Amino acid sequence: MARVTVEDCIDKVENRFDLVLLASHRARQISQGEQITIDRDNDKNPVVALREIADETLSPGDLKEALIHSLQKHVEVDEPEADLPQIASQAEETPDAELAPEENIAFDRMSEEELLAGIEGLVPPEKNDDF
């Protein structure tokens, strides 16, 4: 496929705006180092993303889930409710003396100088030709 147009992808993702969101998210993933599923053919990341969608090497549903997950700031974890009564009954049986060590947890403290020295010691990431 020499040129990828929206018409090549519109039968995979019906809404053009959703297609733009998914393709741009995939292009960002490629820029961050994700493996591409097709030959690059000297194309830029947005074109590669559109070609992946058009060739159906990626599922639009999976891309949509990845996009939603990347935009979420707080992810709720569903925990089974059956475990809650057991935990509550164990807490009632546990004396307060056993709970005290949790309050004595100490966190490492770092001075500003140590923080700056650590930042200066960081190695910048390697340049990537995908841009």
Swiss-Prot record:
Which GO BP terms apply?
Answer: DNA-templated transcription
Extent of the signal sequence:
none
Any one annotated GO CC term: DNA-directed RNA polymerase complex
Question: Which reaction(s) are listed as its catalytic activity?
Answer: RNA(n) + a ribonucleoside 5'-triphosphate = RNA(n+1) + diphosphate
Q: Which InterPro entries match?
A: DNA-dir_RNA_pol_omega, Pol_omega/Rpo6/RPB6, RPB6/omega-like_sf
Keywords for this entry?
Answer: DNA-directed RNA polymerase, Nucleotidyltransferase, Transcription, Transferase
Q: Does the keyword Transcription apply?
A: yes
EC assignment: the record states: 2.7.7.6
Among the GO molecular function terms of this UniProt record, one is: DNA binding
Q: Which family does it belong to?
A: Belongs to the RNA polymerase subunit omega family.
Q: How does it assemble?
A: The RNAP catalytic core consists of 2 alpha, 1 beta, 1 beta' and 1 omega subunit. When a sigma factor is associated with the core the holoenzyme is formed, which can initiate transcription.
Q: State what this protein does.
A: Promotes RNA polymerase assembly. Latches the N- and C-terminal regions of the beta' subunit thereby facilitating its interaction with the beta and alpha subunits.
Q: Can you name this protein?
A: DNA-directed RNA polymerase subunit omega
